[in-house]
Amino acid sequence: VLFEYEILEKESICYLQFNQFADRMTHPNHPELPRFDFVLIDMMKEIEEKNIGTLVVDLQYNGGGNSALGKLLMSWLHPFDKTNWTDVDVRVSDLLCELYPKYRDYTINEKPLEIGKVYDMFSFDQTKPNMDYKIPEGYVQDTSNYMLNLDVDKIYKGNVVFIESRGSLSSSEMLLTTARDNGVGIIVGETSGANPCNYGDILYSILPNTSIRVGTSCKFFTRVNKDLLHEEYLVPDVIVELDDPEKDLVWEWILENYGK
């Protein structure tokens, strides 16, 4: 299961099991997969209808994927235009354009990108969001673009609890770091297994003489809070053991502190 949610009305908790940053949009050859943005729209509507007081986002088994899904979730938890996003620098190369042809069409101020240069990922004309966009009541299931929540009136106003483990890596850790640096919710669980600032998005190729498959990072991710760049790991607000064989200690903590 990539992701699924459950509403616990008695405890006034919505539990979102978020196992991988992947869906139908990131894997277009698998139309049977759900779309994360559609699931979020349904989830938030049900949360509002049932007046749920706490959203728990479980990332302890999430090793990453496409960071766009983290941006989708954050758009429901914090005003999009006031969110400070992780800085993403990307080096444009022939290999990048070969593997991701969209970069051939990307522009900055209507000028094409130059091979070999490093760019701010969010400075491209094509990656700037339309801040006038509102999610329609009856969203179209065959839309070709992700549906961000840009309506501040729909921002979730309850408690938000993220569960982190040593295995919460890559895009998962980026989401946790973005939430922390924007003051969204609290993090419980284990200290992260990687640096909040890191290289990512690996491009794979085959060496012509040896046929060895190699990978090269094309992006560097820098956290929002520059005062914390020295931190080697993301330490949770509340440290809770996750591998107790007898008890689910983190869930017990959540019920004790947020369950009705």
What spans do the regions from the language model cover?
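C-terminal "post-core" interaction segments
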Residues: 1-260
